[in-house]
């Protein structure tokens, strides 16, 4: 079956639609449910967590939600400029899988009595620009950005799992499934030919990540 060729206007509208769905609460629906995400009968609900723990977990999930917003933007930006069709399709498929993470984080934030970060539009725009630029430089570098981004996300998730109370089974199940998926995305991008990024680029990405985590935990 021949793939339908989209006009530049169609592509622009599709990107705009994705941005609106990513940034508008309640518009992203998960296709999957993370394993063991439903609390056990004796597991504490969000409202029964001590207030300091609830605030901390809420801040962590806000960070993770913004991270998924950035992932959506990064993949969409790369897909918009990737030269090889199979690379573009891989970016779009990864973005669809990340939509589950976005929905899970948003739902958990609501359960904890919070709202997503107000800085999401800013980080979406920045990440889209990074993704589009990476795609223009070349597909190997674009895949390298994916690998490095996912590896950094995995480190964040491991840190958050260490901080989330053992009794908060729902949050932990979400983070565990996200970690599994992100590792898969990193390996897939590397195996597809992702280049190792220069040390200055990796350090710059780490610095940007630190700015994101510091601000979105609070705002």
From Swiss-Prot:
Q: In which pathway does it act?
A: Cofactor biosynthesis; ubiquinone biosynthesis
InterPro entries registered for this protein in UniProt: COQ7_proteobact, Ferritin-like, Ferritin-like_SF, Ubq_synth_Coq7
PANTHER family listed in its UniProt record: 5-DEMETHOXYUBIQUINONE HYDROXYLASE, MITOCHONDRIAL, COENZYME Q10 BIOSYNTHESIS PROTEIN 7
- Native species: Alcanivorax borkumensis (strain ATCC 700651 / DSM 11573 / NCIMB 13689 / SK2)
Q: Which reaction does it catalyse?
A: a 5-methoxy-2-methyl-3-(all-trans-polyprenyl)benzene-1,4-diol + AH2 + O2 = a 3-demethylubiquinol + A + H2O
Function as written in the Swiss-Prot or TrEMBL entry: Catalyzes the hydroxylation of 2-nonaprenyl-3-methyl-6-methoxy-1,4-benzoquinol during ubiquinone biosynthesis.
Q: Supply the enzyme class, top level.
A: oxidoreductase
The answer to whether keyword Cell membrane applies is: yes
Cofactor(s) this protein cannot do without: Fe cation
Which of UniProt's keywords are assigned here? Cell membrane, Iron, Membrane, Metal-binding, Monooxygenase, Oxidoreductase, Ubiquinone biosynthesis
- Spell out the Pfam families in the cross-references: COQ7
Protein name (record)? 3-demethoxyubiquinol 3-hydroxylase
Q: What is its EC number?
A: 1.14.99.60
